[in-house]
From Swiss-Prot:
<dbReference type="GO" id="GO:0071424">
    <property type="term" value="F:rRNA (cytosine-N4-)-methyltransferase activity"/>
</dbReference>
<dbReference type="GO" id="GO:0070475">
    <property type="term" value="P:rRNA base methylation"/>
</dbReference>
<keyword id="KW-0808">Transferase</keyword>
<keyword id="KW-0949">S-adenosyl-L-methionine</keyword>
<keyword id="KW-0963">Cytoplasm</keyword>
<dbReference type="InterPro" id="IPR023397">
    <property type="entry name" value="SAM-dep_MeTrfase_MraW_recog"/>
</dbReference>
<feature type="binding site">
    <location>
        <position position="62"/>
    </location>
    <ligand>
        <name>S-adenosyl-L-methionine</name>
    </ligand>
</feature>
<comment type="function">
    <text>Specifically methylates the N4 position of cytidine in position 1402 (C1402) of 16S rRNA.</text>
</comment>
<feature type="binding site">
    <location>
        <position position="105"/>
    </location>
    <ligand>
        <name>S-adenosyl-L-methionine</name>
    </ligand>
</feature>
<keyword id="KW-0489">Methyltransferase</keyword>
<dbReference type="Pfam" id="PF01795">
    <property type="entry name" value="Methyltransf_5"/>
</dbReference>
<dbReference type="GO" id="GO:0005737">
    <property type="term" value="C:cytoplasm"/>
</dbReference>
<feature type="binding site">
    <location>
        <position position="112"/>
    </location>
    <ligand>
        <name>S-adenosyl-L-methionine</name>
    </ligand>
</feature>
<dbReference type="InterPro" id="IPR002903">
    <property type="entry name" value="RsmH"/>
</dbReference>
<protein>
    <recommendedName>
        <fullName>Ribosomal RNA small subunit methyltransferase H</fullName>
        <ecNumber>2.1.1.199</ecNumber>
    </recommendedName>
</protein>
<comment type="similarity">
    <text>Belongs to the methyltransferase superfamily. RsmH family.</text>
</comment>
<feature type="binding site">
    <location>
        <begin position="42"/>
        <end position="44"/>
    </location>
    <ligand>
        <name>S-adenosyl-L-methionine</name>
    </ligand>
</feature>
Amino acid sequence: MSPTGTPATPALQHRTVLLDEAVDALVWRPDGVYVDGTFGRGGHSRAVLARLGPDGALVAFDKDPAAIAEAGTIKDARFSIEHASFAAMAERLAGRGHVAGVLLDLGISSPQIDEAARGFSFRFEGPLDMRMDTTRGITAAQWLAQADEQDIARVIRDYGEERFAVQIAKAIVARRSESGDGGPVATTADLAALVAKAVKTREKGQDPATRTFQALRIHVNQELEDLERGLKAAYDLLQVGGRLVVISFHSLEDRIVKRFMAAHARPQQDADPALRRAPLRAADLPQPTLRLLGRYKPGAEEVAANPRARSAVMRVAEKLAPAGGGARA
């Protein structure tokens, strides 16, 4: 049973990464309003609700219709769910005032990976979809059928950090031209086989298609753009003392989170060339507005129980009062 009494789904179980650590860092006042930006299968949300008092509230977000359906099993008046990206939290929460904490768990869930029809994994043959929200947008297969070679190479290089991005893009376009139907790379197996031929060297312990699949998923879902928008929205929504907790699973995400938090955690002399040249005292500089509370990794026991947790990194920051003071509520 879940912390809120909801029966767990027996199939395609998702192990919530850094569950206790994330909730401990997030919930600092039981009567606060909190945001779970990535409901997934509800592990973090249920644990947060278990920590809240009767006057607390939790608003969750998710793009995935399956996650929205799962959220419907939570019968708790303190809980609500928005079928939207967390990047839209500022608009969706307009009028609710500031919040006590925002949690973003950026990992793709095990049910999403393991469901062949979603097209996220090269381990299962299925349509090359890759959309988090299957009700809108174009699929990975549709994008590959129409994008030019340079764009395909750029996406695979920038979002997959793939050395053979140019060769993979050439192979995709060549297959497209040979087939004459404009879309030969239609399944996960099609793409995995094509990448395996294009990648000339192998990384130990990693399938050659790993980086390409990651890149296409990030692109199709605009994950990095959403992350940048979501971090800004979360920062703006947080009350003084509020917590921002972000769990990332690859270096591209973690780099964005690290830079965002660091930029708000130091005096902003670098933001203005005039300030860089001026002999200002620290007290004269724009003051930090976030306090960094730590960086965390799953322990050996958690990784042994859930190997997918190995790459997780959690960063935590606290909103500070602006110079001259500020309201905490």
